[in-house]
Amino acid sequence: MTFVVTDNCIKCKYTDCVEVCPVDCFYEGPNFLVIHPDECIDCALCEPECPAQAIFSEDEVPSGMENFIELNAELAEIWPNITERKDALPDAEEWDGKPGKIADLER
C-alpha cells in the first residue's frame, strides 16, 4: 500500500506534506508532486498536511482518479527528490479546488 498525490495538487504544489515524510518519498515536477510507491511506508503523516486535500491512500483514491496511481510511480522515477518545504506556486489559491487539472500537468 502507498499514498498517492492526485489532481488537485497540480498548479498548487503545496509542500507541507514533504516536511513530515519520514522517508523522503516525494518527488517534484514543475507544477506537481508525486509519491514514490516503492519508498512510501504508508505512515499517513502526509495526508492531513496537504492543504489541497490531494493525497489519498492508494485504496481510497477517488473514482476517476485511478490513473494517478500509475502516474505517481512513473514520474517518481524521473523527477528529483524533494525533502524540504518550499513556497506554493504563486496562483495556488486560485487553482485549489478546480477540477480536471490533469491537462495542466507539466512534465
Swiss-Prot record:
Binding note for cofactor: Binds 1 [4Fe-4S] cluster. Binds 1 [3Fe-4S] cluster.
Pfam families in alphabetical order: DUF3470 (PF11953), Fer4 (PF00037)
Alphabetical keyword list: 3Fe-4S, 4Fe-4S, Electron transport, Iron, Iron-sulfur, Metal-binding, Repeat, Transport
Gene3D superfamilies in the cross-refs: 3.30.70.20
Binding-site residues, [4Fe-4S] cluster: C21, C40, C43, C46
SUPFAM superfamilies reported in the protein's UniProt record: 4Fe-4S ferredoxins (SSF54862)
GO molecular function: 3 iron, 4 sulfur cluster binding; 4 iron, 4 sulfur cluster binding; electron transfer activity; metal ion binding
Domain 4Fe-4S ferredoxin-type residue range list: 2-30, 31-60
Binding residue positions for [3Fe-4S] cluster: C9, C17, C50
Cofactor(s) it depends on: [4Fe-4S] cluster; [3Fe-4S] cluster
NCBIfam families: FdxA_Protbact
UniProt cross-references to PANTHER family, sorted A to Z: FERREDOXIN, OXIDOREDUCTASE
Task performed by this protein: Ferredoxins are iron-sulfur proteins that transfer electrons in a wide variety of metabolic reactions.
Stated name of the protein: Ferredoxin 1
Source organism per UniProt: Pseudomonas putida (Arthrobacter siderocapsulatus)
Encoding gene, per UniProt annotation: fdxA
